[in-house]
A protein has these predicted regions:
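Binuclear metal-dependent hydrolase catalytic cores
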Residues: 1-163, 168, 173-175, 234-242
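Cap/insert and terminal regions of metallo-dependent hydrolase folds
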Residues: 168-242
Length: 242
């Protein structure tokens, strides 16, 4: 298993970083988690064949995590894809995603590959689905008024990565990330923002490191700097609620 960052920015892309998304690759295929703009281009830049995608996870439906989905589906269809594709999301996001794809006439087209949008279980640390040797588990996290969830990908309990995008520090993510090799965690704010209003449901880079340390990411909590180094880069955005 290996994974690649397709984007690490907040809700506003920078000149060199797009919105948050990662791809996890195994011999059986690839799993895309969140879908920003130009996903096919970014997959190719990462050395991943877009046709290798088997599943897509959309953690929540703020635009920076989902707006690239119609482009992805349309591009795959134009490329001649025949294999089915499954999109996983929260139950309340199934219909909004169907509406988004329908708006661009990409939900169903004559001769198009089979596309399924499937709801995940909302319980903490629950098995969601498998992809070859990958076992995917999820837990709700805490992101203001927008329901969201974190994702853990394990390869036969040998190697793993945990991804939690927009969230404040929370126990559910600590539990999901327990003993993980790598934690990719929201790090929107700098330390000077630690006393931000409670409604700004993101984390500082230091808080992301504290979550990693509490979860003993990378082998133990004794070296917080190492744990912090396993989180996503700090990213500033003028729209902290997205």
């Amino acid at each position: 298993m290996h994974f690649a960052f397709l984007g690490t920015s907040g809700s506003i892309p920078t000149a060199v970083r797009d919105t948050t998304s990662i791809v996890v690759v195994v011999p059986d295929g690839a799993l895309l988690i969140d879908c920003g703009g130009s996903p096919v281009q970014k997959l190719r830049r990462a050395g991943v064949d877009p046709q290798a995608l088997v599943s897509v996870v959309i953690t929540h439906i703020y635009p920076d995590h989902s707006y690239g989905l119609p482009a992805l589906v349309r591009n795959l269809a134009v490329l001649g894809r025949q294999a089915p594709l499954t999109i996983y999301c929260r139950p309340e996001h199934v219909e909004p995603l169907r509406s988004l794809l329908s708006l661009f006439s990409t939900l169903e087209r004559p001769g198009m590959f089979a596309l399924t949008i499937r709801a995940i279980d909302l319980a903490e640390d629950v098995h969601a689905f498998d992809l070859g040797p990958l076992s995917v588990r999820t837990s709700p996290n805490e992101h203001s008024a927008m329901p969201n969830f974190a994702v853990r990908v394990d390869v036969a309990r040998r190697r793993n990565v945990v991804y939690s995008s927009d969230t404040r520090p929370c126990d559910a993510v600590v539990a999901l990330a327990r003993g993980a090799d790598t934690l990719v965690h929201d790090a929107t704010y700098s330390e000077r923002d630690r006393n931000r209003p409670a409604g700004h449901a993101h984390s500082t880079a230091a808080e992301a490191g504290e979550v990693a340390a509490r979860a003993a990411v990378g082998g133990g909590p004794g070296v917080p700097a190492t744990a912090a180094g396993r989180t996503a880069p700090a990213r500033r955005t003028p729209h902290p609620r997205s």
